[in-house]
């Protein structure tokens, strides 16, 4: 009896350790964020059929264009089964790179947003988004993600000036995809292709304003709103939406959050390890007791 209970408990604890220490080779490592609705559709429903059709259209269209929007089925909307969606690649990607990114996003979104009526997956080089309510052409400046790098040296006036110039140039540029550079400082901004010119400028102005006020004194930073983003880095490349190797460590808030999570996880794993060792020890003692059950100290 002791052996059975001990074995069961040991297996449970080992499973807990595995679940708390996920593999770093997860297939979703290269996405920046995912937003999924809590509302779920039923498997094998009409909505799922149309969603699968939409996602397939994303992949097949990347050879012709970096951006496209779809409504499935076409014609009069049917509230319970109609799905709206867009995909968009970074403005300077070639068709092959665009197709690779969108295909990867489509392959991942099913696991990240399983049976969700809406899903929004932002990758390094592209995004895909779908919903059961139309968001096409609708302005949305909701803040989704922002972060700043390490502060620059206060006496590095040259870098501060370059960063300010690059961020400013993103706001005065033309088009929905904008890049800027000054020496070793690079920046990029892009808005969703379904926005009008004025909506795009409005969204980018908000994102760039946040970037300048929050991260203007940092080695880099990024701001992602629902319909646009802006980022810059010192020593990085505008070809990357996320900071390059010289971006620096995360800001103070990010460090505190990450350190707290790390410490908590280390404590939990330490406690579980001690419990496992205790269980193994008790199992060993129990085995000895059964062998020596006629001994007085074990009766």
Curated annotation (Swiss-Prot):
Q: Where in the cell is it found?
A: Cell membrane; Cell junction, Plasmodesma
A Gene Ontology biological process in which this protein takes part is: defense response to bacterium
Which residues form each disulfide bond in the chain? Answer: 36-113, 89-98, 101-126, 148-215, 191-200, 203-228
Main localization category: membrane
Q: Summarize the record's induction comment.
A: By the Pseudomonas syringae pv. maculicola effector HopW1-1. By salicylic acid.
Q: Name one GO cellular component term.
A: plasmodesma
Q: In which tissues is it expressed?
A: Highly expressed in inflorescence nodes and rosette senescent leaves. Mostly expressed in cell wall junctions between leaf epidermal and mesophyl cells, and to a lesser extent at the cross walls between epidermal or cortex cells within the hypocotyl (at protein level). Low vascular expression in seedling and mature leaf, but high expression in senescing leaves (at protein level).
UniProt region (Necessary and sufficient for plasmodesmal targeting), positions on chain? 265-285
Provide this UniProt record's keywords sorted from A to Z. Cell junction, Cell membrane, Disulfide bond, Host-virus interaction, Membrane, Plant defense, Repeat, Signal, Transmembrane, Transmembrane helix, Transport
- Complex and partners: Monomer. Interacts with PDLP1.
Q: Which PANTHER family match?
A: ANTIFUNGAL PROTEIN GINKBILOBIN-2-LIKE (PTHR32080), PLASMODESMATA-LOCATED PROTEIN 5 (PTHR32080:SF59)
Protein's name according to its UniProt entry: Plasmodesmata-located protein 5
């Amino acid at each position: 009896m002791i052996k059975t209970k001990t074995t069961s408990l040991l297996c449970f604890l080992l499973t807990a350790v595995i679940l708390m220490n996920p593999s770093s080779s997860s297939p979703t490592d290269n996405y920046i964020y995912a937003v999924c609705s809590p509302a779920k559709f039923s498997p094998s429903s009409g909505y799922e059929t149309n969603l699968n059709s939409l996602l397939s259209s994303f992949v097949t269209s990347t050879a012709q264009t970096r951006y496209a929007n779809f409504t499935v089925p076409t014609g009069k909307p049917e509230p319970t089964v109609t799905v709206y969606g867009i995909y968009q690649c970074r403005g300077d990607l070639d068709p092959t790179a665009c197709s690779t990114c969108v295909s990867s996003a489509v392959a991942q979104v099913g696991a990240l947003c399983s049976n969700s009526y809406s899903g929004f997956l932002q990758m390094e080089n592209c995004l895909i988004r779908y919903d059961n309510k139309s968001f096409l052409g609708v302005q949305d400046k909701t803040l989704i993600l922002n972060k700043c790098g390490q502060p620059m040296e206060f006496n590095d006036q040259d870098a501060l000036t370059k960063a300010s110039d690059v961020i400013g140039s993103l706001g005065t540029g033309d088009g929905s995809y904008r890049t800027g550079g000054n020496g070793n400082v690079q920046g990029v901004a892009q808005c969703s292709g379904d926005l009008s010119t004025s909506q795009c400028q409005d969204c980018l102005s908000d994102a760039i304003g946040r970037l300048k006020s929050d991260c203007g004194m940092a080695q880099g930073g990024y701001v992602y709103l629902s319909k646009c983003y802006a980022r810059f880095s010192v020593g990085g490349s505008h070809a990357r939406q996320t900071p390059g190797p010289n971006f620096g460590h995360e800001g103070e808030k990010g460090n505190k959050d990450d350190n707290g999570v790390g410490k908590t996880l280390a404590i939990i794993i330490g406690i579980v390890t001690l419990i496992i060792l205790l269980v193994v020890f008790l199992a060993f003692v129990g085995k000895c007791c059964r062998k020596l059950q006629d001994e007085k100290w074990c009766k």
